[in-house]
């Protein structure tokens, strides 16, 4: 099925296009202004027809080398925002709130399923907030509720390194399970209604999360092991278990996890996940602005129609609509609640 870019953008305008992962906030760009830097800002998101964008908050750098403080200084963060992992998280939440205020109603931090549907009906972009790593709460479980009150609606227990809550999937981290603190954090997340992102969980931490009876589990950005690629890709067994719980897996656009740097490599991972999870379990979790390379031909979010075209050459419109956002619309509508 050959389509022109204009035809694809018309589909994007009609569909609920959704992306479950962008690290744009840490770069301290003005998201209200179109930029030649990075992958995402409000003007580019609206241009491509994005309806739901998850903005994820990073508070700690790579293991062994650290460097987040230096990164934040380089990007012009204020001193008080850099002081701790907690202040880093709160500052990024506040930054997104200010950007949304300045958008004059075009973008809203979205905390309920009803608000998501209202935004869709009224042509607004829904911004959903997530946290990469429970180290952001600095061991204080009560801060989960505070983050929820501030608008955060999902969190990964770990990110690029082990923390007090559990184990990271990053190499040489030792495959640690959830700690007693991690179990308490998970229980509190379930209580307040916060989704659990397993994208960076070690296998043992992931197993502990999946054992929780009510955790709202999904993966915001990942490849799948059965299609090849990188070190933290999810196994078919995990994909099936996430699907059984009503979760969705966002397929990443990073070549290091795809095992190749072509758009067709993204399609290959999507198709493998579809074969394991079914049509309701697969979405897009780009990892835009996550300091990763993108496939050839994709320079930023405005090139998303190229992936849409590739999918439409192989699959019917109804399925492509689900992959590009319908499944995450359903997941967040159910997870966010009323």
Feature locations, PLM:
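Acidic, glycine-rich loop-and-beta core segments that form the ion-binding/anion-interacting portion
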Residues: 203, 211-224, 230, 234-235, ...
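A generic "binding-loop/recognition-motif" signal
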Residues: 161, 201-202
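Short, hydrophobic/aromatic alpha-helical segments in well-folded domains
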Residues: 143, 181-185, 205, 269
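Alpha-helical elements of the RecA-like P-loop NTPase motor core of helicases
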Residues: 26, 204-207
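Alpha-helix-loop-beta-strand connector modules within alpha/beta enzyme cores
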Residues: 175-192, 209-217, 310
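Catalytic beta/alpha-barrel core
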Residues: 194-201
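N-terminal hydrophobic targeting/anchoring segments and the immediately downstream early-domain regions
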Residues: 1-174, 225, 229-284, 288-338
């Amino acid at each position: 099925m050959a389509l022109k870019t204009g035809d694809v953008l018309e589909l994007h305008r009609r569909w609920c296009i959704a992306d479950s992962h962008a690290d744009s906030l840490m770069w301290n760009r003005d998201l209200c202004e179109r930029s030649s830097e990075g992958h995402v800002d409000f003007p580019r998101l609206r241009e491509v027809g994005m309806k739901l964008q998850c903005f994820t908050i990073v508070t700690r750098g790579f293991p062994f080398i650290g460097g987040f403080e230096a990164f934040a200084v380089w990007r012009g963060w204020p001193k008080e925002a850099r002081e701790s992992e907690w202040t880093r998280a709160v500052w990024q939440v506040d930054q997104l709130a200010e950007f949304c205020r300045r958008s004059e109603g075009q973008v809203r931090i979205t905390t309920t399923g009803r608000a998501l549907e209202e935004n869709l009906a009224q042509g607004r972009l829904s911004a959903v907030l997530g946290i990469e790593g429970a180290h952001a709460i600095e061991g204080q479980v009560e801060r989960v509720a505070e983050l929820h009150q501030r608008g955060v609606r999902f969190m990964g227990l770990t990110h690029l390194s082990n923390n007090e809550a559990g184990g990271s999937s990053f190499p040489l981290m030792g495959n640690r399970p959830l700690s007693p603190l991690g179990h308490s954090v998970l229980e509190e997340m379930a209580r307040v209604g916060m989704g659990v992102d397993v994208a960076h969980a070690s296998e043992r931490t992931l197993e502990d999360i999946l054992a929780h009876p009510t955790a709202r589990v999904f993966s915001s950005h990942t490849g799948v092991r059965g299609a090849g690629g990188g070190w933290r890709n999810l196994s078919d067994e995990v994909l099936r278990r996430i699907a059984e719980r009503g979760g969705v897996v966002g397929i990443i656009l990073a070549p290091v996890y795809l095992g190749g740097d072509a758009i067709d490599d993204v399609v290959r991972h999507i198709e493998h996940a579809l074969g394991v999870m079914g049509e309701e379990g697969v979405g897009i979790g780009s990892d835009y602005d996550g300091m990763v390379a993108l496939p050839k031909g994709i320079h930023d979010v405005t090139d998303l129609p190229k992936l849409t075209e590739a999918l439409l050459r192989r699959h019917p419109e109804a399925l492509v609509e689900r992959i590009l956002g319908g499944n995450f619309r359903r997941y967040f509508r159910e997870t966010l609640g009323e």
